[in-house]
């Protein structure tokens, strides 16, 4: 990965790749747990992020780390940092 990514101070998320059909683009599914202030129970928040994969090295099911970056297109504002676990 380029050095410019390592210096970026954006948010870092970990998620699972659910689509890699587009060229140099992946869609990452991120799930977070948030505690409800009144009910005191944990609620799952799920969101999809479109991320830039410059080397087309991800496949469906991989666990990846993405970082917030400058806008690359209308929907792409995230960049692939590392593949934490390859899919079987």
From Swiss-Prot:
Keyword set, alphabetical order: Ribonucleoprotein, Ribosomal protein, RNA-binding, rRNA-binding
Pfam families: Ribosomal_S17
GO terms of biological process kind: translation
Keyword Transcription regulation found: no
One GO CC term on file: cytosolic small ribosomal subunit
UniProt GO MF annotations: rRNA binding; structural constituent of ribosome
Annotated PANTHER family: 40S RIBOSOMAL PROTEIN S11 FAMILY MEMBER, SMALL RIBOSOMAL SUBUNIT PROTEIN US17M
Family per record: Belongs to the universal ribosomal protein uS17 family.
Function (record text): One of the primary rRNA binding proteins, it binds specifically to the 5'-end of 16S ribosomal RNA.
NCBIfam families: PRK05610.1, uS17_bact
Oligomeric and partner information: Part of the 30S ribosomal subunit.
Official protein name in the record: Small ribosomal subunit protein uS17
Organism: Lawsonia intracellularis (strain PHE/MN1-00)
């Amino acid at each position: 990965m380029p050095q410019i990514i390592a210096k970026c101070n954006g948010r870092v998320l970990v998620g699972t790749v659910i689509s890699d059909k587009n060229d140099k683009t992946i869609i990452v599914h991120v799930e977070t747990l948030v505690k409800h202030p009144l009910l005191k129970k944990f609620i799952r928040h799920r969101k999809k992020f479109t991320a830039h994969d410059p080397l087309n090295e991800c496949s469906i099911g991989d666990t990846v780390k993405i970082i917030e970056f400058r806008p690359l297109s209308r929907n792409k504002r995230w960049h692939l940092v590392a593949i934490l676990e390859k899919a079987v």
